[in-house]
Amino acid sequence: MGVEKMKAAFENGKKAFIPYVMGGDGGLEKLKERIRFLDEAGASIVEIGIPFSDPVADGPTIQRAGKRALDGGVTLKGIFQALAEVRKEVQIPFVLMTYLNPVLAFGKEHFIERCLEAGVDGIIVPDLPYEEQDIIAPLLRTANIALIPLVTVTSPIERIEKITSESEGFVYAVTVAGVTGVRQNFKEEIHSYLEKVKSHTNLPVVAGFGISTKEHVEEMITICDGVVVGSKIIELLENEKREEICEFIQATKQKEEA
């Protein structure tokens, strides 16, 4: 499990499609069922959001999903239990997207113990600056759980090199300024930014934030090693448009074979 399992998602030129689901949106049984569906549909990795009351990096769709989960009484303990149960049925790598506050409130050591029990392979902490990652990075390294770095369009080359040189799993390249959410298109400089990130790390580079159409997927996958689709996946799951999710996954696979 852990770092090696995520490496396998990118082996031999594979392109990774990484859908995002909000933990507990619709209940914990729904979370398990959605993970089973995404695994069967051919997703490479599943990113599970931990609902939080002050989600500064999230756009309106993900904020609403998190609020639904919290209003429904979902807890971090409950999410870990659901993941541990569904882990027995699926092999797909789990990556948690969590803000730092829930980790600290739960207790760092306890959080990582539960990650191990639930079969979590990596975590993303969007509000944890690189300079402060020692709050949790050594514990994760010991547990063989990847702390996945985020880099942005405004990150200088030196910072990208520094961040990625000490990281594992993959690099999450944020493709827009601001919060997550559906976008119509991407500025041309995004291409050169992604190529810059790719040229300064040996890790797979995954594009995320704002990717919401098959055309976006096809555009990004020609430059990157994978894509994260969040807000759009939440919308499609909420409206039971699962065939469209399968089309997203197929678009990734077709680019892989091209």
Curated annotation (Swiss-Prot):
<dbReference type="InterPro" id="IPR018204">
    <property type="entry name" value="Trp_synthase_alpha_AS"/>
</dbReference>
<dbReference type="InterPro" id="IPR002028">
    <property type="entry name" value="Trp_synthase_suA"/>
</dbReference>
<dbReference type="Pfam" id="PF00290">
    <property type="entry name" value="Trp_syntA"/>
</dbReference>
<dbReference type="GO" id="GO:0005829">
    <property type="term" value="C:cytosol"/>
</dbReference>
<keyword id="KW-0057">Aromatic amino acid biosynthesis</keyword>
<comment type="similarity">
    <text>Belongs to the TrpA family.</text>
</comment>
<dbReference type="InterPro" id="IPR011060">
    <property type="entry name" value="RibuloseP-bd_barrel"/>
</dbReference>
<keyword id="KW-0456">Lyase</keyword>
<feature type="active site" description="Proton acceptor">
    <location>
        <position position="47"/>
    </location>
</feature>
<dbReference type="GO" id="GO:0004834">
    <property type="term" value="F:tryptophan synthase activity"/>
</dbReference>
<comment type="function">
    <text>The alpha subunit is responsible for the aldol cleavage of indoleglycerol phosphate to indole and glyceraldehyde 3-phosphate.</text>
</comment>
<dbReference type="InterPro" id="IPR013785">
    <property type="entry name" value="Aldolase_TIM"/>
</dbReference>
<keyword id="KW-0822">Tryptophan biosynthesis</keyword>
<feature type="active site" description="Proton acceptor">
    <location>
        <position position="58"/>
    </location>
</feature>
<keyword id="KW-0028">Amino-acid biosynthesis</keyword>
<comment type="subunit">
    <text>Tetramer of two alpha and two beta chains.</text>
</comment>
<comment type="pathway">
    <text>Amino-acid biosynthesis; L-tryptophan biosynthesis; L-tryptophan from chorismate: step 5/5.</text>
</comment>
<protein>
    <recommendedName>
        <fullName>Tryptophan synthase alpha chain</fullName>
        <ecNumber>4.2.1.20</ecNumber>
    </recommendedName>
</protein>
